[in-house]
UniProtKB/Swiss-Prot annotation:
Binding annotation for FAD: 34-42, 51, 114, 304, 312
Main location: cytoplasm
Name of protein: Dihydrolipoyl dehydrogenase
Matching Gene3D superfamilies: 3.30.390.30, FAD/NAD(P)-binding domain
EC number(s) from the headed UniProt entry: 1.8.1.4
UniProt keyword terms in alphabetical order: Cytoplasm, Disulfide bond, FAD, Flavoprotein, NAD, Oxidoreductase, Redox-active center
Cofactor section: FAD
Compartments (UniProt record): Cytoplasm
Length: 461
């Protein structure tokens, strides 16, 4: 007997499970199809396991700098298998919690791969092989790491998934690709004592981000001892039993492992799009409107496959928007205030427009930077390097963008995200009492400096 649902979601990653929960809470009969583990790449093979390892690396960093706090450590060892075990325990615990959430919302979970048979039918192949009917379908099949052209992933040529499965630390690691993923792993493994070489084809790393951010990270990495090769051309990658040889700029270099971090490819080739008449472009991206609807009125697409921002928090919000529209509430996706974070050391976070982007839109904008060395809490933490920057409208004082390089940037960016989303002005920030001593004071101080009324920094002459 064919099961019928109001809403069927294919893929249980950050976009899919959030869409399913939102739909179920709107009283829609909801099914969620997943071939692997709930949580998708983010929980199982990306965001969470990498941040669990980074947490361990941060402990190492604190130990290395313990003497400045009057604490003398007589030596330490890095038990990487134990770090990896903790990472797996963290992931398992969160996944179990997620599975409980899905059950508590009375969502029907079907194990297997889902593909479209028509615009209202989905075939499931796997543990729960069946064909189900749905009034609405949400595609949330995500993406996967892109291999280097002509070089498949292997035991030594690793994707971002493969490197998280290592149980021993390499001595020498090459990272092909100086984007966010490449830089995060470079920072992580360098802190753990691995010799790192970042190989980037463009003339600078983090090429898609703010130029000042790129230069700052380059300077920090170089100072830390991370080797960066830009304008690099790779002509060969050869794997042997114990090493990988890379020919870069006509020079042969040897490494224990290679991480390929050159982007991701979209999982849309085998989900039956043609059977339902759903359009995708040459990259595999499924075009959607502001409600996440595809060209087929009852089929929606969310997450990486929309080709917007390949970020878990964007995917989740797209899931909410799609489910809300299916349940009869007209809501649209707003990309004006999307925070992005780079979990290097130091952390980096940004949201909204850069000064260059604001000027390209012919906005009368100004950039104000406030240093952490003038923030008491940062000095007390021994983390006074870096700054927070605000891009504001010179006439209206509306906050247009912000970025921060320094301690706990990933948490600090939330205030500016709220400000930009709600079109707040500089006075909205500095007239709000910020607790002292906290790092968040950097925004109040920065907003005051932008109006040339700084309290803890010399005024501009």
């Amino acid at each position: 007997m064919t099961q019928e649902f109001d809403c069927v979601v294919i893929g249980a990653g950050p976009s899919g499970y959030v869409a399913a929960i939102t739909a179920a809470q709107s009283k829609l009969r909801t099914a969620l199809i997943e071939e692997d583990q709930a949580g998708g790449t983010c929980l199982n093979r990306g965001c969470i396991p990498s941040k669990a390892l980074i947490a361990g690396a941060n402990v190492v960093s604190h130990i290395k700098h313990a003497e400045q706090f009057g604490i003398h450590v007589d030596g330490y060892t890095i038990d990487y298998p134990a770090m990896a075990k903790r990472k797996n325990t963290v992931v398992q615990g969160i996944r179990q919690g997620l599975e409980g959430l899905i059950r508590s919302n009375k969502i029907t979970v079907l194990k297997g791969t889902g593909s479209l048979v028509s615009s209202t039918e989905v075939k499931v192949i796997g543990q729960d092989t069946t064909i189900i009917k749905a009034n609405h379908i949400i595609l949330a099949t995500g993406s996967e790491p892109r291999p280097f052209p002509g070089v498949p992933f292997s035991s030594r040529i690793l994707s971002s998934t493969g490197i998280l499965e290592l149980e021993v630390l390499p001595k020498k690691l090459a990272i092909i690709g100086g984007g966010v993923i490449g830089c995060e792993f470079a920072s992580l493994f360098h802190t753990l004592g691995v010799e790192i070489t970042v190989i980037e084809a463009l003339d600078h790393i983090l090429a898609v981000n703010n130029k000042e951010v790129s230069q700052t990270v380059t300077n920090k990495f170089t100072k830390q001892g991370i080797r960066i090769l830009t304008k690099a051309s790779i002509s060969a990658i050869e794997e042997s039993q114990n090493q990988v040889r890379i020919t870069v700029n006509d020079q042969v270099e040897e490494f224990d492992y290679v991480l390929v971090a050159i982007g991701r490819q979209f999982n849309t080739a085998s989900i039956g799009l043609d059977n339902a008449g759903v359009i995708r472009d040459d990259r595999g991206v499924i075009p959607v409107d502001e409600t996440m609807r595809t060209n087929v009125p009852n089929i929606y697409a969310i997450g990486d496959i929309t080709g917007k921002w390949l970020l878990a928090h964007v995917a989740s919000h797209q899931g909410v928007i799609a489910a809300k529209n299916i349940s009869g509430h007209h809501e649209v996706m707003d990309y004006s205030a999307i925070p992005s974070v780079i979990f290097t050391h130091p952390e980096i976070a940004m949201v909204g427009l850069s000064l260059q982007e604001a000027e390209q839109q012919n906005l009368p904008a100004k950039l104000t930077k406030f240093p952490f060395k003038a923030i008491g809490k940062a000095v007390a933490l021994g983390a006074s390097d870096g700054f927070a920057a605000i891009v504001s409208h010179e006439i209206t004082q509306q906050i247009l963008g912000a970025y921060v390089i320094g301690p706990h940037a990933s948490s600090l960016i939330g205030e500016m995200t709220l400000a930009i989303r709600n079109e707040l002005t500089l006075p909205c920030i500095y007239e709000t009492v910020h607790a002292h001593p906290t790092l968040s004071e950097v925004w109040a101080e920065g907003a005051l400096l932008a109006t040339n009324h700084p309290l803890h920094f010399p005024p501009k002459s």
